[in-house]
Regions:
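HDAC/HDAC-like amidohydrolase catalytic core signature
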Residues: 1-260
């Protein structure tokens, strides 16, 4: 089932949660922000399984592993505190980052390298100073989610300066992309994080069928190497990537760079 109507944030704020619509089609629009993410039989079990996968990877790292990779399906970075969408129901990376920051009292950085900006992760941590969000993505002037992900979105309140968006032009290739990631490493280091959570989207790949960037398999390896240089425990969680014939080798290349 999919929503038939959507409600603006202003309308949702004026109504109590107890006043959500009675019909299922209306309620879906209350909790969803777009049309590409239907609910089906088994959706909850799959989404909860993705969270469990992410939390298992997190626990492996907390128990002493240098890194762990979680093959999360469905992905999570578009899900906000109260809305699902963009194929995402629960924000796997945000759940891990919040859990570690709130229970261990340490700072965490979420590095999102998916082609699409993680609007949900940004919304969740936008006014917090214990979790930094860094996203490298297609320019939202042309790329989903369109209304968020611009470079001037830097965080609010005590979180100001802890949100970094790096949008790219179409056909951006390895050197420009990797250099941009290298440039932000000093800011990540200065933040003082004790763990990094990577939202690993591979839809920046040169032959991805629904995106328009030109990162190669070797470019992914170079990105992993940069993250390795931070020397932080790393939880790597799968987000997007739609050239399914190349997805495995691209994941492998990124993890080889990380030294996983």
């Amino acid at each position: 089932v999919t929503p038939e109507v959507f409600y603006s944030q202003a309308l949702r704020n004026k109504k109590s949660l107890g006043a959500e619509p009675a019909s299922i089609s209306g309620r879906l629009g209350w909790w969803c922000f777009e049309t590409t993410t239907p609910l089906t039989e088994g959706t909850y079990e799959a989404a909860r399984g993705a969270v469990d996968t992410a939390m298992t990877a997190m626990q492996l790292v907390l128990d002493g592993e240098k890194s762990a990779y979680g093959l999360c399906r469905p992905p999570g970075h578009h899900a906000t505190t109260s809305l699902y969408g963009g194929y995402c129901f629960f924000n796997n990376a945000a759940i891990v980052a919040h859990h570690v920051a709130s229970t261990r009292g340490v700072k965490v950085v979420v590095l999102d390298v998916d082609y699409h900006h993680g609007n949900g992760t940004q919304e969740i941590f936008y006014d917090r100073d214990d979790v930094m969000y860094v996203s490298l993505h297609g320019d939202p002037a042309r790329a989903y989610p369109y209304t968020i992900g611009y470079a001037d979105e830097v965080g609010a309140g005590k979180g100001r300066g802890s949100n970094i968006n790096i949008p790219f032009a179409a056909r951006t290739g390895d050197d420009v992309y990797v250099n941009a990631l290298a440039d932000v490493m000093n800011k990540i280091h200065a933040f003082g994080a004790e763990m990094i959570v990577v939202s690993l989207g591979l839809d920046t790949f040169i032959t991805d069928p629904i995106c328009d960037m030109s990162v190669t398999t070797d470019g992914f390896r170079r990105c992993g190497e940069l993250v390795k240089q931070l020397g932080l425990p790393a939880v790597v969680l799968q987000e997007g990537g739609y050239d399914v014939d190349k997805l495995g080798i691209n994941v492998q290349s990124w993890l080889v760079g990380l030294g996983a």
